[in-house]
């Protein structure tokens, strides 16, 4: 029997962002680059070889992959389960969790002030 290759998550399938090591500029493929007229949806690998960082002018080899930040972290078949939290990216989930904890903390602090 032949083994199936492991299934990739949506974050692994999405085109990764790349960050300039010289200045910190982040190339996001879904936004493209308006300064050098690179259309949205262009992956980093498809950029012209002479493309440079629009902020500091560093060449392409100064960029490192930082992964996709806006993609959901799970598998496609699991996105419809739950209350919609599976469609959120990791950063949005963190904001929701820690924001809720902060609101609960403020609630208990207000109870302390009442008594």
Curated annotation (Swiss-Prot):
Keyword Iron applies: yes
Entries under Gene3D superfamilies matching the protein: 2.20.28.10
Keyword Iron in annotation: yes
Cofactor: Fe(3+)
Annotated keywords: Electron transport, Iron, Metal-binding, Transport
Residues given in the record as Fe cation binding sites: 20, 23, 53, 56
Cofactor note: Binds 1 Fe(3+) ion per subunit.
Chain ranges of the Rubredoxin-like domain: 15-66
Domain of life: Bacteria
GO MF, one annotated term: iron ion binding
Functional description taken from the UniProt entry: Rubredoxin is a small nonheme, iron protein lacking acid-labile sulfide. Its single Fe, chelated to 4 Cys, functions as an electron acceptor and may also stabilize the conformation of the molecule. Could be involved in hydrogenase-linked redox processes.
Family: Belongs to the rubredoxin family.
Entry protein name: Rubredoxin
Origin species: Synechocystis sp. (strain ATCC 27184 / PCC 6803 / Kazusa)
Lineage: Bacteria, Bacillati, Cyanobacteriota, Cyanophyceae, Synechococcales
Gene name as annotated: rub
